[in-house]
Amino acid sequence: VLFAGDGGLQMTIQELGTIFQSKIPVKIVLLNNSFLGMVRQWQELFYDRRYSFTEMVNPDFGLIARGNGLSYRCVERREELDEAIAAMKASEGAFLLEVRVEGEENIFPMVPAGAPVSEIRFE
């Protein structure tokens, strides 16, 4: 199972073609917050929310997934998640599960750039 953000997936989206061509049954959970999430998080935590070039207008990931031979499902509410995960697990081939999440939800823990692991941040 691959967990990826929408920004990260778009940087390597051509690999969906490799998955299709090679018939790799990978399961992808796409955490879509419509931001370059880690960059936005840094700008929030270390630069007083002075956001620059982090908000994204995303393509239709369902069309892209299906166009590359992957099954696809989109979750917009927490209540839909269990059923969508079950569908993904039951799928024999490659599957893209898009989970739309809050735009300013942060990912922790994280280690600031240049800092030792002992300075890990949990909030």
What are the functions of these language-model segments?
Residues 1-123:
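Thiamine diphosphate
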